[in-house]
Amino acid sequence: MIEKRHTVRKYLDKPLDVDLVSLLNARIEQNNKLYDLTFKLVTNESDGISSLAKIMSNNTVQNYIILAGKECSSLDEKIGYCGADLILYAQSLGLNTWWCGGMFNGKNALKHLDDKDVRVNGVIAIGYGKTQGVPHKSKTADQISHYQGVVPDWFNAGIKLYYWHQVL
């Protein structure tokens, strides 16, 4: 699934299927409980997306996942792990995503959360992409690692997984 997932910034004007919304909400709830987070899927709304991101997407983003949680030393790590889980899960459901990074409106996103005592750390745009995105230029395993002797399969698999995790 990692190899199939690419950033998509432009989306079709098509509401998310209600069954997919239910599946996404269940996965979000599972991650929220396991990692003490406050993620939330917002549908048919773009107020959590920054003006710049809206320009980049031609105003096609209509759904997003709020990435938030209570302040703690591991918040960024937990958000990164669970955010990656959600973008790969969305891809497995036939949806496309864009981790908007710093291009979000935290105040507007916070309005959708019951708990206002959290830090909104970003949003992930989600929907049916106009395209499936394009792969980024990738480095070879030799360019990002070094192993003396015969390289075992587990090492190459780990390097490949590590690299893909970095470019999500």
Descriptions of predicted regions:
Residues 1-168:
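Acidic, surface-exposed loops and disordered segments
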